[in-house]
Amino acid sequence: MFYFDFDGTLVDVWQRYYQIFKDASGISGMSLEEYIRIKKEFPRDADVARAFGRTLPEDYWTKKRSMLENPAYLAHDRLIVPAEQICEFFQNNPCRILTNRRDPVAFSGQLTALGLESLLDACVVLNPDDKKTKAQFLRENHPVEQIVLVGDAEAEAQAAEIDTVKVFLVRTGLRDPQWIPGVENCYIIESISDFMDADKESV
């Protein structure tokens, strides 16, 4: 069974987070490229604002939370590989999307807008407010089945501590492209497209 993270793995979310940061903070005058460079160096939004000589307004986090899954902002996300390639992979392999979202309805609408409506029944949506990690979900729901988790965040490497789970992380999504996993069964891949094109028997 293959599980794919969504944000950052199948879709590029930088434009959405850039727009949200600008709108929620009121900070303008930065390009998308500047935001990405600074965000990778300083993951905390407060530090990003400080890099521009500003502080975040008191209502920043309230605004950001209301914007994160607003369809108007979700519309900024772009597929990293064509919808046809994703759908074909899911059709030919046992797959699910495993994502963290507070609004499953908005997520379903986003899938449809991106041309992935055929995957609506192949999604597991975890609510981040429940504090359940993807590793916990896999441990509880697949105690013996062999699982492959494909993601883009260093934190997802913890799932590789489960004996039955292999983790593949897309290098372009890592904050540090040179980061080396400290656990076995965790591997770095160059692109999601290359992974989907690879011989699945070798995974």
Short names for language-model regions:
Residues M1-P82:
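N-terminal helical cap/lid subdomain that shapes the substrate entry/recognition surface
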Residues M30, N93, V165:
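Short glycine/serine/threonine/alanine-rich loop segments
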Residues S108-V203:
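Asp-based, Mg2+/Mn2+-dependent phosphohydrolase catalytic module
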Residues A83-F90, I97, L138-R139, A157, ...:
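Short amphipathic alpha-helical segments and helix-helix/interface helices
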Residues I86-L111, L126:
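Substrate-recognition element of Asp-dependent hydrolases with the DxDx(T/V) motif
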Residues R78-V81, R102, D129, D152:
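Short beta->alpha linker loops
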Residues I20, D47-V48, A106-G109, A159:
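Phosphate- and divalent-cation-binding pockets in alpha/beta enzyme and binding domains
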Residues T9, R16, D103, A155, ...:
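Conserved Rossmann-like nucleotide-cofactor binding loop
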